[in-house]
Every structure is written in C-alpha cells, then in structure tokens.
C-alpha cells in the first residue's frame, strides 16, 4: 500500500471537498429551520394580538382601526401595540367602543407640523 505523495494529496483534497459539502448542507438546513421557527413565532404573536384586540374592541372600534390600517399602516401598528399593552397590563376594564377609540387615536396622533410663511 505504498501510495505516492501525489495520491495522498489527491485523497486529502477529495476528503476536504466532501467535508465542505457536508458543512454547507448542514448550514443551509439549519438556516431553513431557523427561518421556519421565526415565521411560526411571528404568526403566533400576530394571532395572539388579534385575539386580544377582538376581545377588547367593539365592532365599531375594530372597523375604525381597520380603516386606519388601510390608510396609515404604521400608525395602525402603533395603535395596536398600545392597545395590546393596555390589555395585558389590565388597564382596559370594558370593551373599547368607537368613541373611546377616537379619543385614543387623538392621543396617539402625531403632532402635525405647521409652517408659517411670511411674505416680505
């Protein structure tokens, strides 16, 4: 079994390539599992959020929130997070109706910038 140094180098090279291929396969499989787990966790959190909102909002308030979500998705997300926080902390006793939702939206509404234009 006397192999020449060239044969040994060639065998080493083949073995290194096999090991690299195995490592690449494991990494891609691990990243797929991680992405799937993150997606499942995100969906679970969204389902919990929707359940809390359904529990604490009347139909009118939910319709108002959905209308805002269509026009201003970022603002609607901020409102939803605030409502979930209030519900989880126990600061919402009854269901929020449309009038209370209007008040909450007024409080959370970003300050509008006003510009004064002076003519000279």
From Swiss-Prot:
One of its GO terms (molecular function) is DNA binding. Residues 10-23 have a biased composition (Basic and acidic residues). Residues 1-55 are annotated as: Disordered. The keyword Electron transport does not apply. It comes from the Archaea. Residues 24-34 have a biased composition (Polar residues). GO terms for cellular component: cytosol. Disulfide bonds: none annotated. InterPro entries: DNA_bind_arc, PDCD5-like, PDCD5-like_sf. Keywords: DNA-binding. Belongs to the PDCD5 family. This is DNA-binding protein HQ_1105A. It comes from Haloquadratum walsbyi (strain DSM 16790 / HBSQ001). The lineage of its organism: Archaea, Methanobacteriati, Methanobacteriota, Stenosarchaea group, Halobacteria.
């Amino acid at each position: 079994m006397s192999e020449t140094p060239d044969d040994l180098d060639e065998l080493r090279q083949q073995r290194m390539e096999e090991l690299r291929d195995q490592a690449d396969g494991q990494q891609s499989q691990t990243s797929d599992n991680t992405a799937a787990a993150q997606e499942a966790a995100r969906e679970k959190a969204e389902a919990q959020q929707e359940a809390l909102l359904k529990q604490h909002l009347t139909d009118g308030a939910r319709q108002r929130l959905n209308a805002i979500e269509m026009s201003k998705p970022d603002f609607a997300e901020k409102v939803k997070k605030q409502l979930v926080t209030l519900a989880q902390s126990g600061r919402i006793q009854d269901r929020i109706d449309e009038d209370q939702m209007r008040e909450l939206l007024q409080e959370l509404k970003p300050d509008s910038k006003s510009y004064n234009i002076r003519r000279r």
